[in-house]
């Protein structure tokens, strides 16, 4: 069941015993959150698994969601999932005339600005076919079309993800029982990632982040192969999305536990995802509240207990969110939540409680997620 997370925020804030000035500041910050949109451009050649990736990340069949073609950027499909807008863009390799047309329309979209004058596209996710040995057209697209037109902070606005890791060596060395690469394939994939980064840096002087994963696949509605490194993919998507917009992803993530389970665990992606979501939510909601609190006496009943109360509540809530990840995640979540709750508790305990209660709701949305 899908929940309206931002409505949960509003409901909990309204129930708190807050000074009216603090409450209005929080509601104003919440309104800012509600207006945030993430525009994710997904680029890749036919057969690289763009649709599968979108489906498995967000738990939707893209053919069944609102699809439209932008009249000024023909060939670019637009999917709207609440405040998340996914722009599905073709890769190159369809002939010179088509490639020139695709390139021009991609560039136009990359230069497009929102109503505030900021670049519309927050992140470009380039998906490569891990089973292909010829990535020449993909490099041409990345080096000559995408990166030169990304504006400032180019490194933080592009992520290159190599899909179909399971067939990178024609199906060899993939452990189907473990749903993970064996040593030979893992080494091959690591080299491929480094090769991609090196070739892009040599051509553009830009150091991009690159990972490998497998979106898995379904046949006739039944899961035939689970995804691999999907948590890693989400982690890097969040890291490359403006912090104040990261909470937008929460309402749209796939809620099937099995989809997020298998990863290389080179990094603690669970903790990283928790910190991104919790930190972003707390940061936006608490922004400016300290200034209001400093000028108001007795802001909250029991405000003197703010630090300890916030820390305790944050720990409980972080644990609840962490339970999405399983037993290990619950421990991580408690630790992260304790820190976040303590920081906000230093501003005002009940604000921490309100934010933390909402974060508890985040955890409940996904049940056994991760």
Feature-to-residue mapping (PLM):
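Membrane-active amphipathic alpha-helices enriched in small hydrophobic residues
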Residues: 270-306, 310, 314-366
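Conserved GTPase G-domain substructure that encodes guanine base recognition and part of the catalytic core
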Residues: 1-85, 89-279, 342, 346, ...
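Eukaryote-biased recognition of electropositive, low-complexity segments
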Residues: 370
